[in-house]
């Protein structure tokens, strides 16, 4: 992000897009580095139904926590972009089911998807 900002002209409006994997399953445990894991044990297999509720929640929560850290780092970088009017908008493309109603991930058709899959986070910083 810092490198991208340094290469931008301060005389023109610019938009940067950053694609993040965020809390995208089934491999939630791969979405946060080891030094950022707060909750253990984690589910480390793709068959989420074979994990305990605690393991699945821990892996997902660690991925959300790490996404929060990345977004905070981006905001700190944008705050330091002197001479630029900066803002950040974060939107997820879908929610995730973690076993609610026997569903996992986000593959149900929209018309029958539970709230966990269709209500998504959105964060704006200006």
Question: What is the role of each PLM region?
Answer:
Residues 1-126:
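Catalytic domains that recognize anionic headgroups
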